[in-house]
Amino acid sequence: MSKTAQIAVVMGSKSDWATMQEATQILDELNVPYHVEVVSAHRTPDKLFEFAENAQKNGYKVIIAGAGGAAHLPGMIAAKTLVPVLGVPVKSSMLSGVDSLYSIVQMPKGIPVGTLAIGPAGAANAGLLAAQILAGWDDALFTRLQAFRENQTNMVLDNPDPRT
């Protein structure tokens, strides 16, 4: 989205975009610039190391990393940078994303990855959480997040009858 991106949204393969675009849609709605890139832990390990080692220098304050199957991307990025990493397990056809969840959530002590839910809801929440992290130092973003939440609440309150 922008060269001034403070959030990077990376994924293990192009097929993960269907899930990870949920994070970028939230960031777009909140007017938060981000960078998007495919970085495969298994197919492009050198690229992964370069991305992670340069994350802070490139201005990223939060990294959202989504992967499916043997989902090593979030953990490997976290191992190579001190920039906070939010991991999104992408639903897989074989084990419905449970394999991805376990790969991301079971990190060893000392290398944290903030793990979200499996699939699109997890990606959307990763976008929200990344924005909330940045909002601690950005009053305008904080205000936009308040409006987002208020809008969510009003959508429920304004439509209480599930039949309509």
Swiss-Prot record:
Substrate binds at S13, D16, R43. It comes from the Bacteria. Its EC number is 5.4.99.18. Keywords: Isomerase, Purine biosynthesis. GO terms for biological process: 'de novo' IMP biosynthetic process. Pathway: Purine metabolism; IMP biosynthesis via de novo pathway; 5-amino-1-(5-phospho-D-ribosyl)imidazole-4-carboxylate from 5-amino-1-(5-phospho-D-ribosyl)imidazole (N5-CAIR route): step 2/2. Disulfide bonds: none annotated. One of its GO terms (molecular function) is 5-(carboxyamino)imidazole ribonucleotide mutase activity. It catalyses: 5-carboxyamino-1-(5-phospho-D-ribosyl)imidazole + H(+) = 5-amino-1-(5-phospho-D-ribosyl)imidazole-4-carboxylate. It holds the Pfam family AIRC. InterPro entries: PurE_ClassI, PurE_dom, PurE_prokaryotes. It is an enzyme of class 5 (isomerase). Catalyzes the conversion of N5-carboxyaminoimidazole ribonucleotide (N5-CAIR) to 4-carboxy-5-aminoimidazole ribonucleotide (CAIR). Belongs to the AIR carboxylase family. Class I subfamily. PANTHER family: PHOSPHORIBOSYLAMINOIMIDAZOLE CARBOXYLASE, PHOSPHORIBOSYLAMINOIMIDAZOLE CARBOXYLASE CATALYTIC SUBUNIT. This is N5-carboxyaminoimidazole ribonucleotide mutase. It comes from Haemophilus influenzae (strain ATCC 51907 / DSM 11121 / KW20 / Rd).
